[in-house]
Swiss-Prot record:
Residue(s) at site: Reactive bond: 63-64, 134-135, 232-233
Domain notes: This inhibitor contains three inhibitory domains. The first domain interacts with VIIa and TF, the second one with Xa.
One biological process term in Gene Ontology: response to estradiol
Top-level taxon in the UniProt lineage: Eukaryota
Residues carrying sugar: 144, 251, 261
Keywords assigned by UniProt, alphabetized: Blood coagulation, Disulfide bond, Glycoprotein, Hemostasis, Protease inhibitor, Repeat, Secreted, Serine protease inhibitor, Signal
GO MF annotations, alphabetized: serine-type endopeptidase inhibitor activity
Family annotation (Pfam families): Kunitz_BPTI
Name of this chain's protein: Tissue factor pathway inhibitor
Protein function: Inhibits factor X (X(a)) directly and, in a Xa-dependent way, inhibits VIIa/tissue factor activity, presumably by forming a quaternary Xa/LACI/VIIa/TF complex. It possesses an antithrombotic action and also the ability to associate with lipoproteins in plasma.
Cystine residue pairs: 53-103, 62-86, 78-99, 124-174, 133-157, 149-170, 222-272, 231-255, 247-268
Cellular localisation: Secreted
Organism: Rattus norvegicus (Rat)
Limits of the BPTI/Kunitz inhibitor domain: 53-103, 124-174, 222-272
Length: 302
Protein backbone atom coordinates (compact mmCIF):
# COMPACT_ATOMS: atom_id res chain seq x y z
CA UNK A 1 0.00 0.00 0.00
CA UNK A 2 2.79 2.37 0.93
CA UNK A 3 4.68 1.63 -2.29
CA UNK A 4 1.57 2.32 -4.34
CA UNK A 5 1.11 5.73 -2.71
CA UNK A 6 4.73 6.59 -3.39
CA UNK A 7 4.32 5.67 -7.07
CA UNK A 8 1.16 7.80 -7.34
CA UNK A 9 2.93 10.79 -5.78
CA UNK A 10 5.90 10.38 -8.15
CA UNK A 11 3.58 10.15 -11.19
CA UNK A 12 1.63 13.31 -10.33
CA UNK A 13 4.84 15.18 -9.48
CA UNK A 14 6.20 14.34 -12.92
CA UNK A 15 2.96 15.48 -14.57
CA UNK A 16 3.08 18.83 -12.72
CA UNK A 17 6.70 19.35 -13.72
CA UNK A 18 5.93 18.73 -17.40
CA UNK A 19 2.95 21.09 -17.32
CA UNK A 20 5.12 23.85 -15.85
CA UNK A 21 7.76 23.45 -18.60
CA UNK A 22 5.44 23.23 -21.63
CA UNK A 23 4.38 26.96 -21.68
CA UNK A 24 8.01 28.06 -21.70
CA UNK A 25 8.76 25.74 -24.61
CA UNK A 26 5.74 27.00 -26.55
CA UNK A 27 6.78 30.64 -26.02
CA UNK A 28 10.36 29.98 -27.11
CA UNK A 29 9.57 28.19 -30.39
CA UNK A 30 8.02 31.13 -32.32
CA UNK A 31 10.94 33.42 -31.39
CA UNK A 32 13.46 30.95 -32.78
CA UNK A 33 11.44 30.61 -35.99
CA UNK A 34 11.30 34.40 -36.39
CA UNK A 35 15.05 34.71 -35.90
CA UNK A 36 15.68 32.04 -38.49
CA UNK A 37 13.41 33.69 -41.02
CA UNK A 38 15.01 37.14 -40.54
CA UNK A 39 18.53 35.79 -40.86
CA UNK A 40 17.75 33.98 -44.09
CA UNK A 41 16.15 37.07 -45.62
CA UNK A 42 19.02 39.39 -44.65
CA UNK A 43 21.92 37.21 -45.80
CA UNK A 44 21.20 35.52 -49.08
CA UNK A 45 23.79 33.11 -50.46
CA UNK A 46 26.44 34.89 -52.54
CA UNK A 47 28.96 33.31 -54.87
CA UNK A 48 32.19 35.36 -55.09
CA UNK A 49 34.11 35.67 -58.35
CA UNK A 50 37.04 33.60 -57.04
CA UNK A 51 37.30 30.77 -54.53
CA UNK A 52 40.01 32.52 -52.49
CA UNK A 53 37.57 35.38 -51.81
CA UNK A 54 35.80 33.02 -49.40
CA UNK A 55 38.92 32.61 -47.25
CA UNK A 56 39.01 34.29 -43.86
CA UNK A 57 41.30 37.26 -43.25
CA UNK A 58 44.73 35.99 -42.22
CA UNK A 59 47.26 38.45 -40.82
CA UNK A 60 50.18 35.97 -40.91
CA UNK A 61 52.88 35.29 -38.31
CA UNK A 62 54.95 38.46 -38.82
CA UNK A 63 54.60 41.62 -36.74
CA UNK A 64 54.33 44.40 -39.32
CA UNK A 65 51.21 46.57 -39.43
CA UNK A 66 50.20 46.91 -43.08
CA UNK A 67 46.74 48.16 -43.90
CA UNK A 68 45.09 45.69 -46.27
CA UNK A 69 41.61 44.62 -47.38
CA UNK A 70 39.78 41.29 -47.61
CA UNK A 71 36.35 40.12 -48.78
CA UNK A 72 34.05 39.18 -45.89
CA UNK A 73 31.64 36.40 -46.90
CA UNK A 74 29.34 37.18 -43.96
CA UNK A 75 28.81 40.88 -44.73
CA UNK A 76 29.32 40.52 -48.52
CA UNK A 77 31.65 43.51 -48.41
CA UNK A 78 35.36 44.27 -48.61
CA UNK A 79 36.68 45.25 -45.20
CA UNK A 80 39.95 46.46 -43.75
CA UNK A 81 42.36 44.39 -41.66
CA UNK A 82 45.96 44.66 -40.51
CA UNK A 83 48.39 42.35 -42.32
CA UNK A 84 51.54 41.21 -40.54
CA UNK A 85 53.71 41.32 -43.66
CA UNK A 86 54.32 37.65 -44.51
CA UNK A 87 52.39 34.52 -45.52
CA UNK A 88 48.61 34.87 -45.15
CA UNK A 89 46.40 33.94 -48.12
CA UNK A 90 45.16 35.31 -51.44
CA UNK A 91 42.18 37.08 -49.88
CA UNK A 92 44.31 40.15 -49.27
CA UNK A 93 44.42 43.35 -51.33
CA UNK A 94 46.37 46.58 -51.14
CA UNK A 95 43.37 48.79 -51.96
CA UNK A 96 39.63 48.67 -51.35
CA UNK A 97 38.97 49.15 -55.05
CA UNK A 98 41.12 46.13 -55.98
CA UNK A 99 39.25 43.95 -53.47
CA UNK A 100 35.84 45.00 -54.80
CA UNK A 101 36.76 44.47 -58.45
CA UNK A 102 38.24 41.03 -57.72
CA UNK A 103 35.59 39.53 -55.45
CA UNK A 104 32.20 41.27 -55.83
CA UNK A 105 30.13 40.09 -58.85
CA UNK A 106 28.85 42.93 -61.02
CA UNK A 107 30.77 45.58 -59.10
CA UNK A 108 30.90 49.00 -60.71
CA UNK A 109 33.37 51.61 -59.57
CA UNK A 110 31.65 54.28 -57.48
CA UNK A 111 32.46 57.76 -58.69
CA UNK A 112 31.20 61.24 -57.90
CA UNK A 113 30.90 63.89 -60.59
CA UNK A 114 32.39 67.25 -59.63
CA UNK A 115 31.30 70.71 -60.77
CA UNK A 116 33.96 70.62 -63.49
CA UNK A 117 32.40 67.44 -64.92
CA UNK A 118 35.27 65.13 -63.90
CA UNK A 119 34.51 61.87 -62.10
CA UNK A 120 36.47 60.79 -59.03
CA UNK A 121 36.38 57.74 -56.73
CA UNK A 122 34.15 58.33 -53.71
CA UNK A 123 37.05 57.90 -51.26
CA UNK A 124 38.69 61.07 -52.65
CA UNK A 125 36.09 63.03 -50.69
CA UNK A 126 36.95 61.45 -47.33
CA UNK A 127 38.68 63.65 -44.78
CA UNK A 128 42.32 63.26 -43.80
CA UNK A 129 42.60 60.39 -41.29
CA UNK A 130 45.98 59.68 -39.59
CA UNK A 131 44.66 56.51 -37.90
CA UNK A 132 45.06 55.43 -34.29
CA UNK A 133 48.72 54.42 -34.21
CA UNK A 134 51.67 56.67 -33.35
CA UNK A 135 53.88 56.43 -36.40
CA UNK A 136 55.11 59.47 -38.32
CA UNK A 137 54.87 58.38 -41.96
CA UNK A 138 54.63 60.90 -44.79
CA UNK A 139 51.55 60.26 -46.91
CA UNK A 140 49.32 62.26 -49.25
CA UNK A 141 45.57 62.84 -49.32
CA UNK A 142 43.18 64.73 -51.59
CA UNK A 143 41.85 67.87 -49.89
CA UNK A 144 38.37 68.53 -51.26
CA UNK A 145 38.51 72.11 -49.95
CA UNK A 146 41.71 73.18 -51.72
CA UNK A 147 41.05 70.78 -54.65
CA UNK A 148 44.61 69.44 -54.56
CA UNK A 149 46.67 66.66 -53.02
CA UNK A 150 48.46 67.57 -49.80
CA UNK A 151 50.89 65.94 -47.41
CA UNK A 152 49.95 64.61 -43.98
CA UNK A 153 51.45 62.41 -41.29
CA UNK A 154 50.01 58.89 -41.12
CA UNK A 155 50.15 56.95 -37.85
CA UNK A 156 50.73 53.62 -39.57
CA UNK A 157 47.44 51.75 -39.11
CA UNK A 158 43.73 52.06 -39.95
CA UNK A 159 42.68 55.44 -41.39
CA UNK A 160 40.79 55.45 -44.72
CA UNK A 161 41.38 55.01 -48.45
CA UNK A 162 42.20 58.69 -49.04
CA UNK A 163 45.80 57.82 -48.29
CA UNK A 164 48.55 57.61 -50.93
CA UNK A 165 52.25 56.78 -50.65
CA UNK A 166 53.27 59.22 -53.39
CA UNK A 167 52.05 62.64 -54.50
CA UNK A 168 51.88 61.44 -58.10
CA UNK A 169 49.55 58.56 -57.21
CA UNK A 170 47.25 60.94 -55.34
CA UNK A 171 47.14 63.42 -58.22
CA UNK A 172 46.49 60.74 -60.84
CA UNK A 173 43.63 59.30 -58.77
CA UNK A 174 41.83 62.33 -57.37
CA UNK A 175 42.89 65.67 -58.88
CA UNK A 176 41.20 67.21 -61.91
CA UNK A 177 43.22 67.05 -65.15
CA UNK A 178 43.50 70.84 -65.17
CA UNK A 179 43.78 72.43 -61.75
CA UNK A 180 43.40 76.21 -61.84
CA UNK A 181 42.37 76.53 -58.24
CA UNK A 182 44.08 78.95 -55.89
CA UNK A 183 46.49 77.45 -53.38
CA UNK A 184 45.92 78.45 -49.78
CA UNK A 185 44.24 81.83 -49.36
CA UNK A 186 46.42 83.59 -51.94
CA UNK A 187 45.21 83.96 -55.52
CA UNK A 188 47.89 82.84 -57.96
CA UNK A 189 46.03 82.58 -61.26
CA UNK A 190 43.82 85.66 -61.56
CA UNK A 191 44.52 87.87 -64.56
CA UNK A 192 43.58 91.43 -65.41
CA UNK A 193 43.88 93.32 -68.68
CA UNK A 194 46.32 96.20 -68.15
CA UNK A 195 48.51 96.34 -71.27
CA UNK A 196 47.66 96.84 -74.92
CA UNK A 197 49.55 95.97 -78.09
CA UNK A 198 48.84 97.31 -81.58
CA UNK A 199 49.08 94.81 -84.45
CA UNK A 200 48.04 95.91 -87.95
CA UNK A 201 46.38 99.01 -86.50
CA UNK A 202 44.26 96.81 -84.20
CA UNK A 203 44.50 97.28 -80.44
CA UNK A 204 44.85 93.87 -78.74
CA UNK A 205 44.55 93.67 -74.95
CA UNK A 206 47.33 91.67 -73.26
CA UNK A 207 46.59 89.69 -70.10
CA UNK A 208 48.91 90.29 -67.19
CA UNK A 209 48.89 88.84 -63.70
CA UNK A 210 46.89 90.78 -61.13
CA UNK A 211 49.06 92.76 -58.73
CA UNK A 212 49.25 91.35 -55.23
CA UNK A 213 51.18 92.27 -52.15
CA UNK A 214 52.66 88.79 -51.85
CA UNK A 215 52.19 85.69 -54.01
CA UNK A 216 52.68 82.23 -52.54
CA UNK A 217 52.80 79.14 -54.74
CA UNK A 218 53.67 76.54 -52.10
CA UNK A 219 51.52 73.94 -50.30
CA UNK A 220 48.64 75.30 -48.24
CA UNK A 221 49.80 73.59 -45.03
CA UNK A 222 52.89 75.83 -45.01
CA UNK A 223 50.53 78.72 -44.20
CA UNK A 224 49.28 77.09 -40.98
CA UNK A 225 50.52 78.63 -37.71
CA UNK A 226 53.02 76.75 -35.55
CA UNK A 227 51.19 74.24 -33.32
CA UNK A 228 53.08 72.71 -30.38
CA UNK A 229 50.54 69.85 -30.01
CA UNK A 230 48.85 68.20 -27.04
CA UNK A 231 51.48 66.08 -25.26
CA UNK A 232 54.24 66.97 -22.79
CA UNK A 233 57.45 66.20 -24.69
CA UNK A 234 59.87 68.88 -25.89
CA UNK A 235 61.21 68.17 -29.38
CA UNK A 236 63.00 70.66 -31.61
CA UNK A 237 61.01 71.19 -34.80
CA UNK A 238 60.75 73.79 -37.55
CA UNK A 239 57.78 75.55 -39.14
CA UNK A 240 57.41 77.95 -42.05
CA UNK A 241 56.49 81.52 -41.09
CA UNK A 242 54.70 83.07 -44.10
CA UNK A 243 54.86 86.57 -42.61
CA UNK A 244 58.66 86.70 -42.91
CA UNK A 245 59.10 83.99 -45.55
CA UNK A 246 61.50 81.92 -43.41
CA UNK A 247 61.58 78.67 -41.44
CA UNK A 248 61.77 79.09 -37.68
CA UNK A 249 62.33 76.72 -34.76
CA UNK A 250 59.67 75.83 -32.18
CA UNK A 251 59.14 73.22 -29.46
CA UNK A 252 56.84 70.30 -30.35
CA UNK A 253 55.21 68.27 -27.55
CA UNK A 254 55.15 64.97 -29.46
CA UNK A 255 51.54 64.50 -30.60
CA UNK A 256 48.78 66.46 -32.32
CA UNK A 257 49.66 69.70 -34.06
CA UNK A 258 49.43 70.24 -37.82
CA UNK A 259 51.39 69.57 -41.01
CA UNK A 260 53.54 72.73 -40.78
CA UNK A 261 55.99 70.69 -38.74
CA UNK A 262 59.42 69.54 -39.95
CA UNK A 263 62.22 67.65 -38.22
CA UNK A 264 64.96 69.70 -39.90
CA UNK A 265 65.25 73.24 -41.24
CA UNK A 266 66.35 71.85 -44.59
CA UNK A 267 63.10 69.87 -44.91
CA UNK A 268 61.11 72.99 -44.08
CA UNK A 269 62.95 75.09 -46.68
CA UNK A 270 62.66 72.38 -49.30
CA UNK A 271 58.90 72.02 -48.80
CA UNK A 272 57.79 75.61 -48.27
CA UNK A 273 60.37 78.29 -48.92
CA UNK A 274 61.57 77.63 -52.43
CA UNK A 275 58.29 78.50 -54.15
CA UNK A 276 57.74 81.81 -52.40
CA UNK A 277 61.35 82.94 -52.82
CA UNK A 278 61.38 82.72 -56.62
CA UNK A 279 59.20 85.76 -57.23
CA UNK A 280 60.75 87.85 -54.50
CA UNK A 281 64.25 87.17 -55.85
CA UNK A 282 63.15 88.07 -59.38
CA UNK A 283 61.63 91.31 -58.14
CA UNK A 284 64.79 92.16 -56.20
CA UNK A 285 66.97 91.53 -59.28
CA UNK A 286 64.69 93.71 -61.42
CA UNK A 287 64.86 96.54 -58.89
CA UNK A 288 68.68 96.30 -58.72
CA UNK A 289 68.93 96.37 -62.51
CA UNK A 290 66.71 99.44 -62.69
CA UNK A 291 68.77 101.24 -60.06
CA UNK A 292 72.05 100.41 -61.81
CA UNK A 293 70.63 101.52 -65.17
CA UNK A 294 69.52 104.86 -63.71
CA UNK A 295 72.95 105.31 -62.10
CA UNK A 296 74.77 104.67 -65.40
CA UNK A 297 72.51 107.07 -67.27
CA UNK A 298 73.06 109.74 -64.62
CA UNK A 299 76.87 109.33 -64.86
CA UNK A 300 76.81 109.51 -68.65
CA UNK A 301 74.76 112.71 -68.60
CA UNK A 302 77.10 114.39 -66.12
Amino acid sequence: MTNKLKKDHAFWAAVCLLLSIVPELLNALPEEDDDTINTDSELRPMKPLHTFCAMKAEDGPCKAMIRSYYFNMNSHQCEEFIYGGCRGNKNRFDTLEECRKTCIPGYKKTTIKTTSGAEKPDFCFLEEDPGICRGFMTRYFYNNQSKQCEQFKYGGCLGNSNNFETLEECRNTCEDPVNEVQKGDYVTNQITVTDRTTVNNVVIPQATKAPSQWDYDGPSWCLEPADSGLCKASEKRFYYNPAIGKCRQFNYTGCGGNNNNFTTKQDCNRACKKDSSKKSSKRAKTQRRRKSFVKVMYENIH
